[in-house]
């Protein structure tokens, strides 16, 4: 991806652990690499199709001076986040914050922290089979759409499906949402579980009924296997109620292990697997 580079932006701010750092202030320097597509701006010479690096510098200075932080890690994190939120053409950035006047009682050239942050593509499956199912789904998706570090991309239709896993219970309403997020996979999982709890989700029976179920299916092409999170979702290839809505909004997204697309996995499941999708008569959720 193309880059816009900013080097040595000088900012006077009041960050540091010691009281004198907060009181007197000191000079900080910022380097930034902005990852963006400059093609259209390069062909048309139109500023609105580019990222105004002057405005980026102004915003970084504003964020650095707006609050006082103990750690340069915190100052760098906040600065990177605000830039990514304010400039939609920037997909990713590298930011290095230098603190050359740090209170170190030995000769040194510089102290800095360097971070990389960016937007990530995630797919979340949603489902409900208790109470007012549409209400729970609408409320859950609304929570995700309104999260400051998430941007909704697409939401599938709602599919009526039979239960999966052998537990006798009511039919489900299921679908899939694509979003872009600045959250890490673990932060996104924490948010999904929080939204489930707010909807009264109780984990009493494995594959049992639930007011709201939110599963992280895919996160970029990441492969994660921990006690708390497995990505890609370990059973997604066996669930037509996941693959059908996923195929509707992103038929060519691929599984990181097998390389198979959602469309290919759904076709295989139609011939060899269980069928749970009953109909797709429901409209998309607002």
Segments and roles (model prediction):
Residues 1-124, 128:
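N-terminal, polar/charged subdomain of small-to-medium soluble alpha/beta proteins
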Residues 7, 91, 151-156, 244:
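A short, local hydrophobic-aromatic micro-motif
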Residues 37-42, 119-121, 164-171, 183, ...:
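Flexible, gly/pro- and Lys/Arg-enriched active-site loops
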Residues 42-54, 146-184:
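Short, surface-exposed acidic-centric catalytic microdomains
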Residues 79, 83-84, 144-145, 192:
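Hydrophobic C-terminal alpha-helix "anchor/cap" residues
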Residues 96-100, 158-160, 217-219:
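Short loop/turn motifs enriched for small/polar and acidic residues
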Residues 119-150, 156-160:
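N-terminal beta1-alpha1 ligand-phosphate binding loop
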Residues 139-144, 188-195:
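Short amphipathic alpha-helices in soluble, non-transmembrane regions
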């Amino acid at each position: 991806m193309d880059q816009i580079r900013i080097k040595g932006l000088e900012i006077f701010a009041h960050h540091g652990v010691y009281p004198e750092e907060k009181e007197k202030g000191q000079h900080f320097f910022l380097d930034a690499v902005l990852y963006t597509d400059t093609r259209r701006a390069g062909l048309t010479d139109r500023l609105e199709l580019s990222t105004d690096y002057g405005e980026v510098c102004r915003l970084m200075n504003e964020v650095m001076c707006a609050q006082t932080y103990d750690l340069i890690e915190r100052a760098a994190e906040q600065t990177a986040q605000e830039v990514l939120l304010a400039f939609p053409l920037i997909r990713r950035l590298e930011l290095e914050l230098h603190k050359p006047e740090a209170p170190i009682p030995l000769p040194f050239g510089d102290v800095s922290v360097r971070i990389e942050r960016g937007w990530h593509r995630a797919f979340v499956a949603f489902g409900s089979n208790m109470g007012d199912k549409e209400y729970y789904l609408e409320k859950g998706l609304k929570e995700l759409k309104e999260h400051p570090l998430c941007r909704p991309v697409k939401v599938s239709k709602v599919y009526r499906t039979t239960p999966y896993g052998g537990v006798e219970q009511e039919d489900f309403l299921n679908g899939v949402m694509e979003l872009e997020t600045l959250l890490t996979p673990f932060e996104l999982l924490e948010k999904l579980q929080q939204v489930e709890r707010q909807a009264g989700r109780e984990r009493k029976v494995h594959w049992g009924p639930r007011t709201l179920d939110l599963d992280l299916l895919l996160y970029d092409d990441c492969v994660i296997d921990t006690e708390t999170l497995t990505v890609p979702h370990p059973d997604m290839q066996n669930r037509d109620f996941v693959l059908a809505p996923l195929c509707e909004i992103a038929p060519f997204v691929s599984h990181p292990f097998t390389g198979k697309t959602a469309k290919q996995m759904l076709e295989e499941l139609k011939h060899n697997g269980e069928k749970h999708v009953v109909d797709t008569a429901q409209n998309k959720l607002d």
